[in-house]
């Protein structure tokens, strides 16, 4: 009779160290069902689940939605005086990726790492090589904090804008009617800087979103532009069983109502056979016109929406939370008060790394779940093109072999040029599998700015929040060890540093016998006082204190409960 792991693990003596010497393989869900972890999070501690709407609950179809936004923005630019030829451009989803930086001085799109080092540089449709890049960026580096010059195109809404900027720069650089300059272009005596062009594009994008017909055309053909997932009601109803669920969106009520009605327009309720429910019934709190990221700071006045007309009722709402009421404005502090929750009780789920994730974490301490729809393709390439990744590893091995028996006394210079060329070729082929700008998360071995932001601010991330459906609400999302190079490339074998290293590299932190006279202060320099400190040396912790990665505050909770009991 075999014993299940769950039964064996009930006994501390049967923990992995004593599991009959068999190698254990960690169980993992299918890649397309996975939720990935940057910081450990215990789901049973989450009391409230918060959602953004656009690109989170409502996922817009790609490239249909981006094409619509692109076309409308081009039409707006032409209407204010830009050349008619621009109407011939068609959105190409293989070119842009999120997280690119636009240099408004030189008109370049830059893919950079977390420190501002340039990984890819494109001027229009022309991908610049190393020498060209160094002419404008001598160290292949930018000052990211120069926000007046560099604009980060971080959101999914930025994708059409990213491609449009490339189209415009390429057009004005190569069209015979215009004279190309380093910082813009000339039409006779008229000069247009890339900075002015960029501002025109920004203004046109804002006009399309807030005054134009983007939302109108979207709701006219929702099946074409919005993904409907029949599992959505089931997940929200299960969340309702273990906590509160709320919606915070920047969209107005009329648009929100049409989108949400479509998402929940199913022949059944949470489960097949159950009766249909209105979308409002799945949420304890609904808040529109949030104006994130301002919402996570001082916020705006909280008002009540008249759901019959979509207009706001007069006055500030000061009452308690009421089920079925739709609110406008407000702030994250107000949400916490209405829900009776504090920062870490809340898991907020959104797609906007700045407006949703960074601000909710830094200002409120909310736990964060970042939705990254591109992750599905990233995982596909990662698994489908594994041969390219394996070849890169093999090339690293060949490179190491060439230097294997050489040290500082060697005059031999191995010819590594062919290996370097092959590494560049394989890295390029690998990048092109993702699109013209390469992976969202890396360029070769270098992680992108976007990847560093995901790791820094998102506790959890996945291609879709629907993946939470495949985990119990008691689940502990435990972060994997993030290894530094000296940890990931060194085997777990004992090395005696006293015998193998120079005296300059032997600093250690092992215990010493401080009672030995050799470690007492020298009597000639200072006499030892007869009055000794209460604790002469620190004591090694006898209880578990170094457990910051487990999202485990049991002792704090017990202390709080004891204090509450004493007060009663």
UniProtKB/Swiss-Prot annotation:
The keyword Cell membrane does not apply. InterPro entries: HAD-like_sf, HAD-SF_hydro_IG_5-nucl, HAD_sf, Pur_nucleotidase. Mg(2+) binds at residues 52, 54, 351. The active site is at residues 52, 54. Binds 1 Mg(2+) ion per subunit. It catalyses: a ribonucleoside 5'-phosphate + H2O = a ribonucleoside + phosphate; a 2'-deoxyribonucleoside + a ribonucleoside 5'-phosphate = a ribonucleoside + a 2'-deoxyribonucleoside 5'-phosphate; IMP + H2O = inosine + phosphate; GMP + H2O = guanosine + phosphate. Homotetramer. PANTHER family: 5'-NUCLEOTIDASE DOMAIN-CONTAINING (PTHR12103), CYTOSOLIC PURINE 5'-NUCLEOTIDASE (PTHR12103:SF17). This is Cytosolic purine 5'-nucleotidase. It comes from Xenopus tropicalis.
């Amino acid at each position: 009779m075999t014993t299940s792991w769950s039964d064996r693990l009930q006994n501390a003596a049967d923990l992995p160290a004593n599991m009959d010497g068999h190698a254990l393989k960690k169980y993992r869900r299918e890649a397309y069902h996975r939720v990935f972890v940057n910081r450990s999070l215990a789901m049973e501690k989450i009391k409230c689940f918060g959602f953004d709407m656009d690109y989170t609950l409502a996922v817009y179809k790609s490239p249909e939605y981006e094409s619509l936004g692109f076309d409308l923005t081009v039409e707006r630019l032409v209407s204010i005086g830009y050349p008619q030829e621009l109407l011939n451009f068609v959105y190409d989803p293989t070119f842009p990726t999120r997280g690119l930086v636009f240099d408004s001085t030189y008109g370049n799109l830059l893919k950079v790492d977390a420190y501002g080092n340039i990984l890819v540089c494109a001027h229009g449709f022309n991908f610049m090589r190393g020498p060209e890049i160094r002419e404008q960026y001598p160290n292949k580096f930018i000052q990211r904090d120069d926000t007046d010059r560099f604009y980060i195109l971080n959101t999914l809404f930025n994708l059409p804008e990213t491609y449009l900027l490339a189209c415009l720069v390429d057009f004005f650089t190569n069209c015979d009617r215009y004279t190309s300059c380093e910082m813009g272009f000339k039409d006779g005596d008229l000069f247009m800087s890339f900075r002015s062009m960029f501002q025109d594009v920004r203004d046109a994008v804002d006009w399309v979103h807030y005054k134009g017909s983007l939302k109108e055309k979207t709701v006219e053909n929702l099946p074409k532009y919005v993904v409907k997932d029949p599992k959505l009601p089931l997940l929200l109803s299960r969340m309702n069983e273990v906590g509160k669920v709320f919606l915070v969106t920047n969209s107005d009520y009329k648009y929100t109502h049409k989108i949400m009605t479509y998402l929940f327009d199913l022949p059944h309720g949470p489960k097949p056979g159950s009766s249909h429910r209105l979308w409002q019934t799945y949420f304890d709190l609904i808040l529109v016109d949030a104006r994130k990221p301002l919402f996570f700071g001082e916020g705006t006045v909280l008002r009540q929406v008249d759901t019959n007309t979509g207009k706001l009722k007069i006055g500030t709402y000061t009452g308690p939370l009421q089920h079925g009421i739709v609110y406008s404005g407000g702030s994250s502090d107000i949400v916490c008060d209405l829900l009776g929750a504090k920062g870490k009780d809340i898991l907020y789920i959104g797609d906007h790394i700045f407006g949703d994730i960074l601000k909710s974490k830094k200002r409120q301490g909310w736990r964060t779940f970042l939705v990254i729809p591109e992750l599905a393709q990233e995982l596909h390439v990662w698994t489908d093109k594994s041969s390219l990744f394996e070849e890169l590893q093999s090339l690293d091995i060949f490179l190491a072999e060439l230097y294997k028996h050489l040290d500082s006394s060697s005059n031999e210079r191995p010819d590594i040029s062919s290996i370097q060329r092959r590494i560049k070729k394989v890295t390029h082929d690998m990048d092109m599998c993702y699109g013209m700008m390469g992976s969202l998360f890396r360029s070769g071995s270098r992680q992108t700015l976007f990847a560093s932001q995901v790791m820094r601010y998102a506790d959890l991330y996945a291609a879709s929040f629907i993946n939470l459906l495949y985990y119990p609400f008691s689940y502990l999302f435990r972060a994997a060890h993030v290894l530094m190079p000296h940890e990931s490339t060194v085997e777990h074998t004992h090395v005696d540093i006293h015998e193998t290293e120079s005296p300059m590299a032997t600093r250690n932190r092992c215990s010493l016998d401080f009672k030995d006279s050799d470690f007492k202060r020298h009597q000639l320099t200072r006499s030892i006082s007869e009055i000794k400190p209460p604790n002469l040396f620190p004591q090694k912790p006898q209880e578990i204190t170094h457990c910051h990665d487990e999202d485990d505050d049991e002792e704090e909770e017990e202390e709080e409960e004891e204090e509450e009991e004493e007060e009663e």
